[in-house]
Swiss-Prot record:
GO terms for biological process: dorsal closure; intercellular transport; monoatomic ion transmembrane transport; phototransduction; phototransduction, visible light. GO terms for molecular function: gap junction channel activity. Pfam families: Innexin. Disulfide bonds: none annotated. The gene is Inx3. The lineage of its organism: Eukaryota, Metazoa, Ecdysozoa, Arthropoda, Hexapoda. It is found in: Cell membrane; Cell junction, Gap junction; Cytoplasm; Lateral cell membrane. It comes from the Eukaryota. This is Innexin inx3. Residues 1-37, 136-183, 294-395 are cytoplasmic. Structural components of the gap junctions. Essential for proper epithelial development of the epidermis. GO terms for cellular component: apicolateral plasma membrane; cytoplasm; gap junction; lateral plasma membrane; membrane; plasma membrane. It comes from Drosophila melanogaster. Residues 59-114, 205-272 are extracellular. Its main location: membrane.
Amino acid sequence: MAVFGMVSAVSGFIKIRYLLDKAVIDNMVFRCHYRITTAILFTCCIIVTANNLIGDPISCINDGAIPMHVINTFCWITYTYTIPGQQHRQIGTDVAGPGLGNEYGQEKRYHSYYQWVPFVLFFQGLMFYVPHWVWKNMEDGKIRMITDGLRGMVSVPDDYRRDRQDRILKYFVNSLNTHNGYSFAYFFCELLNFINVIVNIFMVDKFLGGAFMSYGTDVLKFSNMDQDKRFDPMIEIFPRLTKCTFHKFGPSGSVQKHDTLCVLALNILNEKIYIFLWFWFIILATISGVAVLYSLVVIMMPTTRETIIKRSYRSAQRKEIAGLVRRLEIGDFLILHFLSQNLSTRSYSDMLQQLCGLLGASRTPSAPSTLEMNRISHPIYPPVETFGGGKETET
């Protein structure tokens, strides 16, 4: 029941669902962070937590001098260790397992991360949601208000559609060159996504004792090595068998040392989770970096904006598009780009055609803000409940 409760809480938090009439205020790379990555991390957190609750995450073997539950609890809440110098010795003849053996004069590698894995995964899930939360609050529903009634597959009368298009066009013309703050907020959150995934890679590397950076490449090398010579790097980072030392007082008051052998069954799960996260973080960092570079190109090169607009408005002449782009600042372009993702092709093409004519014929006055438009006697935006039958759910 506790596991189902956690699943319900997580699903209510990340709200992974798709609405045809939901306002689009970001791109696919952005959604890979707050939807896919957050869902992956929270799911892994639930799986590890359920494994700890249902099974025995650690089972230690001793000579019977110490109760089993005592030594299990002690080794779980403190740490276990392996001997790196004993990793490559023959199992069954020289050592009992990888990293186990005579520890005299040998360096020890301590393992205490396993008790913190669910908490770290949950914290990482929150980290990947933060940029979206920041952007959603800074965006403040602007695109949803502008495009309300024309998004998705909602069928509306032609008169209503034309009226809505005219109002969107009026807002856009009247608010021309006032959206730069809006665009810079978006690009800042896009950069925040890239920084966040890089920080997470270094954070996990620190958490696993500096072994995460080369974890994926080591596993790939291992799979290509000769069967008789290879050593699994996953066992070195996530050992199944470890040692634990328990001290207690003997009958005469002297300190007695008890060596125990601990089986960490949960590491079979941990190694699979982190090898997947290694590849996913590398992919996510790559596409996020490309997205940031792409945004820089769009900001610095107006010809790129012409190409993007032309792609969604194929019937226009390049001269018309070039004239339109010259009148638009980067914030206006971003609003126009989001409109292309939320409006139907017909509505967007009609609006662009009228926009090219209007901006080519007149200068634009200063504009009211989106909030001011809600207080004028004839509001540009009709009530949300006019179409759709209910309140829109946002992520």
